[in-house]
Amino acid sequence: MNIINKIEQEQLKADVTPFNVGDTIKVHTRVIEGGKERIQIFQGIVIAKRGSGINEAFTVRKISYGEGVERVFPLHTPRIAKIEVVNRGKVRRAKLHYLRGRIGKDAMIVKSANR
């Protein structure tokens, strides 16, 4: 069991930007199409974080052309180039799945003043 933990520790990213549920973030993802590699940006609200260590993942939700789009990203994947925090949100829940049923201003998160 100790060997597994040691290998997992080697695979963890050291430069992960700290963020929480409710924050609006930009996830810069490396996309390989054919032989070319480019960066694709996915901006939205973090509605959930789960797991720990190498298994840690987070879910980001945005509204694109009137449709809700959610994407789950593993935190320590090499496909993520960087994560930028756009706004810090003030929420009282660990999971914001209730945002799925809300549209427009009703789905907005209050900005945090001190975080």
Swiss-Prot record:
Keyword field contains Ribosomal protein: yes
Gene Ontology terms: biological process: translation
**Disulfide linkage:** none
GO annotations of cellular component type? cytosolic large ribosomal subunit
Which molecular function terms from Gene Ontology are attached?
structural constituent of ribosome
Q: Which UniProt keywords apply?
A: Ribonucleoprotein, Ribosomal protein
Family per record: Belongs to the bacterial ribosomal protein bL19 family.
UniProt function note? This protein is located at the 30S-50S ribosomal subunit interface and may play a role in the structure and function of the aminoacyl-tRNA binding site.
Name this protein carries in UniProt: Large ribosomal subunit protein bL19
Its organism's taxonomic lineage begins at: Bacteria, Pseudomonadati, Verrucomicrobiota, Verrucomicrobiia, Verrucomicrobiales
